Amino acid sequence: TTQFARTRATAQPTVTALGLMPTVVPATSPSHIQDVVTEIRKHPGKTVLVVGHSNTVPAIVEALGAKRPGAICDSRYDNMFVVIMAGDGKASVVHSTYGEASPRDTTCAAMR
């Protein structure tokens, strides 16, 4: 997660249910994307929850070796990307949604 309240609140139900201690990776760091990837790679073979922002998640997915998703609207809070890291180093991504659907924002170019 990042230091911001929205990402922490999104992660909180999972953190509480599984008794986890979240790792905070500052979103304001110039090396944020690589810092997140480094943290993920510390847990090979494990499931890692990354709660991020519309302007960083696509780059994180790509940095993990999967196809970069399209732009995400700032007003969309229901996107979920599952990156599957294969043993051979290849990665793939599945895009889904969760929870209550975000209202359709017709002003967002990414949704047109």
What residue spans do the PLM features occupy?
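Low-complexity, compositionally biased segments
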Residues: 38, 81-82, 103, 108
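Conserved histidine-centered catalytic loops in small-molecule metabolism enzymes
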Residues: 1-23, 89-112
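Ligand-binding grooves and catalytic loops that recognize ribose/phosphate and carbohydrate rings
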Residues: 58-64, 85-98
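Phosphate-coordination/substrate-recognition cap region in phosphate-metabolizing enzymes
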Residues: 1-72
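Short, surface-exposed, polar/charged, turn-prone segments marking secondary-structure boundaries
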Residues: 26-28, 52-53, 76-80, 110-112
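Domain-level recognition of soluble alpha/beta enzyme cores
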Residues: 69-89
